Amino acid sequence: MTEKKTFAIGRRALLTAAAVLPFMGIAARASAAEKLGFGELYKSFGPLGLEFSDKVKQLSGQEVAISGFMAPPLKAEAAFFVLTEIPMSLCPFCSSDADWPDNIMVVYLSAKQTFVQFNAPIVARGVLEFGSWTDPETGFISQLRLRNAAFRTV
């Protein structure tokens, strides 16, 4: 009789694992952010300015991860920062999106995090948005953004 009980437990565990296994793959894919590099943000510069790459257009609304450096924040309690391709100790952006550099991205944090030094390499991860947008709270104009983002040092 104990053999039957052992068999029933083994069978139950096997059936549970078989039922859960497909969902584990979906969860792993959902949590794996697509990697994006600064060299992949734009495809050309023409009379109308920078043109977003096909990859940026395809990944819009999806979670991406991008490596870079945190520019010095405008204020210590800011809910966002500017991610740059190279370390910058000074403000890397202008007030107009017409002068938007091709190697920065605004990162809007989903939760407060302690900012890091400008020369510490980080990976930011969040939902990609593109197109000119003005932050109603700060007046900050951006062309590329990560929303609901977080970062970690690497």
Regions inferred by a protein language model and the residue ranges of each:
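N-terminal export signals
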Residues: T2-I9, A13-A32
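OB-fold and OB-like single-stranded nucleic-acid-recognition modules
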Residues: A30-V154
